[in-house]
Amino acid sequence: MQAARAIYLVLDMQNDLVHAEGPNGKSPLGEQVRKRELLVKTARAIKKAREAGVLVGFVRVGFTAGYPECPPNSPVFSAAPANGLFKLGAWGTEIHPDLEQREGDIQVTKHRVSPFYATGLEAALRARNVTKIYCSGVSTQAVVQATVRDGHDRDYEMIVLEDLSCAHSDQEHENSMGSLARFCKVEKSDTVTFTNP
């Protein structure tokens, strides 16, 4: 039987959301990304996870031409077509260039907030016998919350790297982390020890 594995999922760290030249670069979210030094710290965490033999995966939100997968009634996504956001194949849906991707990393494209909804993520994790998920990204109140709750209910051990996640304000981030603490372990990137189960 294949040994149990862990993965570090990097959530929605794509140019449309975290690049200084992207549409959110001058928004409150962009300010939080810079203030919390998310890019440099996430790059360090990816390196640390790889050195520990932990798998790495990248999650992005994206829609094909014409946005057929985009939910028209969603307050989160319904404005994407009019604003040209999250177009697959475009610069905006590329993972930020400061975050090293390698061949063999798990790549997940999602059309909703949760990376588990209507994607191949769970099949990829089960095939690799992943039982523990480390995660971080933007935003805390959206993809991080959804990943933790959905992962918890699928019986994964969930760990959030708190300092590598952010929301549109400190208060939103803190409120989200407070509600997540029941469903996961909360760690800091400089003290976390990445381990396989």
List each model region and its residues.
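Active-site-adjacent betaalpha module
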Residues: 1-7, 44-52, 63, 69, ...
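A short alpha/beta connector and helix-capping loop motif
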Residues: 4, 22-49, 53-58
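Short glycine-rich His-centered loop
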Residues: 9, 18-19
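Positively charged, low-complexity intrinsically disordered leader regions
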Residues: 14-15
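Short, flexible, mixed-charge acidic loops at enzyme active sites
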Residues: 19-25, 70-75
